[in-house]
Amino acid sequence: MRLTAQVINEAPEILNPEGKLTLLLRDLQITELENLAITQNKYQVIDLSNNDLISLGNIPKRFNNLQCLLLSNNNISYIDDESFPSDNHITSITLFNNNIYQFQKSFKDKFPKLETLILLGNPITEMENYRYFIIWLIPSLKVLDFKKVKQAERKTSEDMFGTNRDEFNSLAQQMFKNENTEIKLDGKSDRQVKNFVKKMTDEERQQLLKKLETATSIEEIERIENDLKEGAV
């Protein structure tokens, strides 16, 4: 389905638990982001979960009200460098269960204010030193994959990749070479919590997915993380 002006204008809007105005565009089989400018920078959260997006782009420039993108359960494999502006004010992105399989050098420029990032369920998380490299690329991060970024992790990342983020040392360069590696990109249904909650029932998995898709604060993320450690949903 195309994300037309009519679809956007007819989409429901809610106040989320944090009181942030949220545009609900989930479950519409949307394949490409477009026409978001007609929202006139009104929304703090845009929920695009459970669609068929293959890239993250076409975010209007000067959308300084937009703080959170919920993008779980799509087929996103890359950030569109040309149409994803660097002057955004986004602090939280949930990309749970997508197809991101390689690092992009633009990560360090595209997320200047990003504090919370969820990439679980993406092939990239299986790469060696994945967590350290993401922390190095996006130093503003406070929470990555439901875990607080620790000062010791920041130090380790700088020990590995250097303190100058304008230069990529040999190890950093190696992290970008995943494009030549043959990786199986699963469909959404195959990826869903495949390696994350293997012992949970189908009903529990759906509850977990719902929580992942709507978590927008550090407090929520910490609570979900504790639940997972204790085996609760």
From Swiss-Prot:
CC annotations in GO: Prp19 complex; U2 snRNP; U2-type prespliceosome
Domain LRRCT: 122-160
Function: Involved in pre-mRNA splicing.
GO MF term list: U2 snRNA binding
Primary location class: nucleus
Domain of life of the native organism: Eukaryota
Lineage per the UniProt record: Eukaryota, Fungi, Dikarya, Ascomycota, Saccharomycotina
N-terminal signal peptide: none
Subunit and partners: Associated with the spliceosome.
Gene: LEA1
Keyword tags: Leucine-rich repeat, mRNA processing, mRNA splicing, Nucleus, Repeat, Spliceosome
Protein name: U2 small nuclear ribonucleoprotein A'
Ranges occupied by LRR repeats: 20-40, 42-63, 65-86, 89-110
Entry keyword annotation includes Protease: no
UniProt keyword DNA-binding present: no
Cellular localisation: Nucleus
GO biological process, one term: mRNA splicing, via spliceosome
Pfam family, one: LRR_9
Family membership: Belongs to the U2 small nuclear ribonucleoprotein A family.
